[in-house]
């Protein structure tokens, strides 16, 4: 069934089997959707306490992991075989240290089966878009976390991703680099009209940059609230932002009985 | 090894050399512990003629290096199978590892000497199998430690199993495999010499056996020095290759 949504997650549950044969549930009937961005991309986030299954959910959306139940739809079609349409950027740096910047991007083009993937003539354009011009021959292991994150973003663009999933991206970044990276992601999602979905345990971060926030409860993870952010009122010092943050904290306290987690 | 450590080692080696020359050439009388340096120099000529050093040396060195290089490339070629869990070939190869834990590998060489006529091919096969098993066991062990983020990000980009094996897992473990190859290189030299010694035929092990039979201490000493020198050069070549082509560090 075709829908107007770019991403739709229907009743996704996930169980893992422990070493002693015990079965434990990480995700329980997750339902969420992100509509197709018209212009300017869309920025959504999943907030949850630590160890609530955010990464598992992201891996299921990108088809790296299979759900125990339920399905993931991209533009109305079941997405269960990764092809570069949904690109997952893990929390730890994942740019390949044996490839330089250009080779990392070429790799993404080579392996992506996505019809929207870029061709090799666009590599310079992508490198420029992520701010790595002049560093084409540099290797990621010689550089900072921020540099390596830019390579991961460049690969996602090269693969022609419609959705980029970013797993807790700002944990290891200091404030200045974090702001730079946030601005970069926002610019890229606007230029390439992409949906960015990132996971975090930091309410402040999520409220300041997202258009839409999903609250994921502690294990087994369930989406228990969806919040739309009014972007026109967004300002770090504004009362509106403070009230949204308070509301989220209260929702978590009431739902998970956890005093604070961020 | 860091450069100051290498310098220190070189200085130490030079010190031992000088100590040996001073003690055994000028101070101590002729003895059965170490030969006089001047006698060792003279024995090089005898090594060349009487012990047929060039042919024997070539036999050993070619067996060691051809086996090592061939095993490395065969293991690399088969690595996608080795990485797979529950593949029958992978499981079979790995099960043989069990024998090598409890039975010293040289015993396999003794059986080969017993089963087959003396030939350079048998020594080569022995070394090739040794190197191959050593490498695949290391590959299998290291493959389970590959940073999972590399694999996950490659999968989400659309990479298939074969590309992940060759371009992600292999590349990820390559520096550690090359580090292991340095140790393996030394072990192959040892096994080759012991094999040749037992077999009592050509090769450096054959020279050691003959020199022992003749009680020729200076020849024993000279062959030991030459062997050490070539093991050192081989090690340096592998390290050079590793630094040049596997410059990344995953630690």
Q: Predicted segment positions?
A:
Chain A
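Hydrophobic anchor residue at the start of the ABC signature
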Residues: 153
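Conserved ABC ATPase "signature" region
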Residues: 117-135, 187
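Conserved ABC transporter NBD signature motif
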Residues: 70-82
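Catalytic Walker B motif of ABC-type/P-loop ATPase nucleotide-binding domains
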Residues: 164-168
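Conserved ABC ATPase signature
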Residues: 139-143, 147
